[in-house]
Amino acid sequence: MTALSAAPLRAQVGYDPPSSPYRDLRQTQELTFFSGYFRAKADPARVAPQSGPIFGALYQWRPSGPMHLNVSVSRVSSERRVLDPDLPGTCSGVPAGDCKLIDTFQWPLYFIDGGLALALTGARSFYHLVPEVKLGAGVATDFHSQADVGQFQFGTRFAFNWGAGIRWVPGGAFQVRADLSNHLYAVKYPGTYYVPAPDKSVIFTNTQSQTAWLNNPSITIGISYLFSR
């Protein structure tokens, strides 16, 4: 009698499918439109594109299991300072250190990224949530092919990216996702920043490296359309 009663008890271990917190993810692809804020790190000369709102689109595909492939395009509504190394180092009526500043200009910054994302709950959600970690690479560009008056050019440069996110998948064809990301890229200063002006002032002395690596975090929220082939 005891042996017969043990079998149904063993069958009850775990969750009944209707009450389980796990749900299989049926769709394998998503198209997300997102917006948020890009927090640019100030470079030593403060001439790189600055912080601003960011928006863009993300395509993500899950070929199998927890692994995802993704590609995204985004735009930052940024500004950038333009310096003239030939201007005098001392002046009146402007903040200290800004005597060589010509002006601050609207300067949009664009990212084209590709990478991998790993869903920590596998090919399913946990209480409708899917946490992710991601890693990738791409380019950052301002689409300017010529240097400014001070010979500085941001141009197009290689950028690493990584971060984490969480997806809320309530069921159906839509989801909401939030992501915390970081872009790492370098800016390079021209030789003119180290050449004395007529008054012997310089933007940089030789102790400042010509290359500065910048970490630039961003936080975004997006709405996704989910689908499969």
What are the roles of these predicted feature ranges?
Residues 11-63, 142-144, 203, 218-229:
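Short glycine/proline- and aromatic-enriched beta-strand/turn motifs that initiate or cap beta-hairpins
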Residues 171-229:
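Predominantly the C-terminal beta-signal and adjacent terminal strand-loop region
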Residues 13, 23, 81-102, 187-209:
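Solvent-exposed loop segments that connect transmembrane elements
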Residues 24-28, 46-52, 103-111, 151-159, ...:
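Transmembrane beta-barrel outer-membrane domains
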Residues 18-19, 41-45, 96-105, 145-153, ...:
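Extracellular loop and loop/strand-boundary signature of outer-membrane beta-barrel proteins
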Residues 33-37, 71-75, 133-141, 166, ...:
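Transmembrane beta-barrel strands of outer-membrane/channel proteins
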Residues 58-149, 157, 170, 216-229:
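Gram-negative (and chloroplast) outer-membrane scaffold detector with strong preference
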